[in-house]
């Protein structure tokens, strides 16, 4: 039985943890402003430190990161001897680059209070003040951050060989790259702990194969921790990641009735606003202006990357100069994502991050005051994660989800059943058709100035419709209920896109616009020149009726049916090829078959040998400070 804390000591005091935390950890918590543990930390840290596998489900913003970082650090610093060179003691896996970076930064901040680790992480330069030196036998924690897009796998391996880190913080794809090297070791004698942060997303089918390949390279005798805001929805998959009799920790929030009925922080107020489609974007200015004091950090969530690209050009015109709008989505280049993320984090003026669900999970964006879900998420699980960007660590926050009148209002009851209740937005906001018309005119003025923006709008609208049609709550979000003309005008479109979903639409597809499309130009001179050339070529050659009919026939097929047709063709092609190979094999003599098998075996062995030699050459070259030629590795783009 664990000893009880001294009389008068709060169970959530850092010095009440059993087994006791190191003095330098207590000093770090005090210096970082954490006066006492959060409920999830008070529950999870003692269990994880006591060699238990843990499954931790707690509301977003509840301090889960320190719940696993402190046990990992304490475990590695209490070993009998240092971990061997090029051996790994702990791994922390995150679904996104941004979240992995934040975990690494928190870990580095913590280790700054442990002199041996701090010296290993940031060795002194010639012009720096001399740092104390520690013998090689001194226990220390040396982390390495692995991110696709910022470094190549060869550079990661070179850093690993040079610094010999014992803790890896990584996204799944880049981690698997490193663990595939024969120079990286995770034997049972060295490896201690595995942490899966945002575990339900890591256990999603999209990451299943990568995760399984990683787990095959790790010893089964280890401590494993799963941390997330909604672990319960992935519990049936926990066995697959090798937990042994895990202890489940669930930390919920009491609602007004005093019953544990909420899955979000008590400091977060979740609301909804019902607005007609034509007023949707015009309402955004009213929302951010009505919140007092003015929110310094706001996040707007939309459903698609194309939507971010288009609305990042339109919304600043509607919001005015009072807010800095910054786009962020998963298809941005890694350096662009990091740059925009840092701009938002470091902005001293009111800023709005326009993003997709790439920013909905795990990111600890400090001081977010307001979250607006312009598009309700296709996956209801994402709703809680989006809202949870505000109201973190006890800070007051507000979230608003925009709904169309009618059937979409049933989403309120749907959320109530899922224990994420929302209340009407207050103060109430009134709209007029004149406000909506003015917003449409402002957006269209920008679109008319550049045909490229029109193209982006058409693409974004189609992309939004596809996402809308995939809502898991399909009985609430129905394409057949959409008001096409109102939506098109709200988006600032000059016409509705050609979509099979509009095949039976009898309204005004031009949205009341009359435009000379032949003379509607791109701002980019090269692009406009090319458009005119194509227009001239089409006029001179003339499109044949059969070609025109064929194109129209293709357009009349829904995008989902087109994708299904392509998949069927590919499957038939593969089946045909397989039959041909089988027939050729059956015609061979036994001697011929044996020769083929021997040849294939030799080719495979040679391929593996060459690949290993290339990996080794690159690693050695990088370790020596040289740049290996032909080292153009594909960058891992992360998860969206």
Swiss-Prot record:
CDD domains: DEADc_DDX55, SF2_C_DEAD. It catalyses: ATP + H2O = ADP + phosphate + H(+). A motif (DEAD box) lies at residues 197-200. It is an enzyme of class 3 (hydrolase). InterPro entries: CTT_SPB4, DEAD/DEAH_box_helicase_dom, Helicase_ATP-bd, Helicase_C-like, P-loop_NTPase, RNA-helicase_DEAD-box_CS, RNA_helicase_DEAD_Q_motif, SPB4-like_CTE. Disulfide bonds: none annotated. SUPFAM superfamilies: P-loop containing nucleoside triphosphate hydrolases. Residues 630-640 have a biased composition (Acidic residues). GO terms for biological process: rRNA processing. Residues 521-629 form a coiled coil. Residues 577-593 have a biased composition (Basic and acidic residues). A motif (Q motif) lies at residues 14-42. Component of pre-60S ribosomal complexes. Belongs to the DEAD box helicase family. DDX55/SPB4 subfamily. This is ATP-dependent rRNA helicase spb4. It comes from Aspergillus fumigatus (strain ATCC MYA-4609 / CBS 101355 / FGSC A1100 / Af293).
């Amino acid at each position: 039985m664990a000893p009880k804390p001294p009389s008068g000591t709060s169970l959530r005091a850092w010095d009440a943890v059993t087994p006791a935390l190191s003095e330098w950890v207590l000093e770090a918590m005090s210096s970082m402003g954490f006066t006492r543990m959060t409920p999830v930390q008070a529950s999870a840290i003692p269990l994880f430190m006591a060699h238990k596998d843990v499954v931790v489900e707690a509301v977003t913003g509840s301090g889960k990161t320190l719940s696993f970082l402190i046990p990992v650090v304490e475990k590695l610093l209490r070993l009998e001897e240092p971990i061997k060179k090029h051996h790994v003691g702990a791994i922390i896996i995150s679904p996104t680059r941004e979240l992995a970076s934040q975990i690494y930064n928190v870990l580095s901040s913590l280790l700054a209070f442990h002199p041996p680790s701090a010296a290993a992480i940031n060795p002194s330069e010639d012009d720096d003040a001399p740092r104390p030196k520690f013998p090689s036998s001194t226990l220390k924690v040396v982390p390495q951050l692995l991110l696709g897009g910022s470094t190549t796998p060869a550079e990661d391996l070179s850093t690993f060989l040079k610094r010999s880190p014992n803790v890896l913080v990584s996204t799944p794809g880049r981690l698997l790259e490193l663990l595939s090297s024969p120079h990286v070791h995770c034997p049972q004698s060295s490896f201690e702990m595995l942490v899966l942060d945002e575990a339900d997303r890591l256990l999603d089918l999209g990451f299943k194969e990568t995760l399984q390949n990683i787990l095959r390279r790790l010893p089964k005798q280890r401590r494993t921790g799963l941390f997330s805001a909604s672990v319960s929805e992935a519990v049936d998959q926990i066995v697959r990641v090798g937990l042994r009799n895990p202890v489940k920790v669930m930390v919920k929030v009491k609602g007004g009735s005093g019953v544990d009925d909420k899955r979000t922080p008590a400091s977060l107020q979740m609301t909804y606003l019902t607005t007609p489609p034509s007023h949707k974007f015009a309402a955004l200015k009213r929302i951010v202006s009505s919140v007092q004091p003015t929110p310094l950090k706001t996040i707007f969530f939309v459903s698609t990357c194309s939507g971010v690209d288009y609305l990042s050009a339109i919304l600043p015109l509607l919001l005015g100069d009072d807010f800095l709008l910054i786009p962020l989505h998963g298809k941005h280049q890694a350096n662009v994502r990091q740059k925009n993320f840092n701009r938002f984090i470091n902005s001293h003026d009111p800023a709005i991050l326009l993003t997709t669900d790439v920013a909905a999970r795990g990111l600890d964006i400090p001081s977010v005051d307001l979250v607006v879900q312009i598009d309700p998420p296709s996956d209801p699980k994402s709703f809680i994660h989006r809202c949870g960007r505000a109201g973190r660590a006890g800070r007051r926050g507000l979230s608003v989800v925009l709904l169309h009148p009618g059937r979409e209002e049933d989403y309120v009851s749907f959320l109530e059943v899922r224990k994420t209740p929302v209340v009407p937005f207050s103060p109430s906001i009134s709209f007029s058709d004149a406000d909506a018309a003015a917003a449409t005119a402002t957006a269209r003025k920008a679109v008319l100035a550049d045909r490229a923006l029109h193209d982006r709008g058409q693409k974004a609208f189609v992309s939004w419709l596809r996402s809308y049609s995939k809502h898991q709550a399909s009985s609430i979000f129905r394409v057949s209920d959409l008001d096409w003309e109102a939506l098109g005008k709200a988006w600032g479109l000059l016409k509705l896109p050609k979509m099979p979903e509009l095949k039976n639409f009898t309204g005004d597809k031009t949205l009341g616009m009359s435009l000379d499309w032949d003379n509607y130009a791109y701002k980019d001179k090269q692009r406009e020149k090319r458009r005119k050339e194509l227009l001239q070529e089409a006029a001179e050659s003339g499109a044949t009726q059969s070609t025109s009919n064929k194109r129209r026939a293709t357009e009349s097929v829904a995008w989902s049916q087109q994708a299904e047709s392509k998949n069927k063709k590919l499957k038939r092609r593969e089946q045909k090829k397989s039959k041909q190979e089988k027939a050729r094999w059956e015609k061979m003599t036994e001697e011929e078959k044996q020769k083929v098998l021997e040849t294939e075996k030799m080719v495979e062995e040679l391929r593996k040998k060459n690949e290993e030699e290339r990996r080794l050459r690159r690693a050695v070259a990088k370790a020596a400070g040289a740049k290996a030629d032909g080292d153009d590795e594909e960058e891992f783009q992360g998860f969206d």
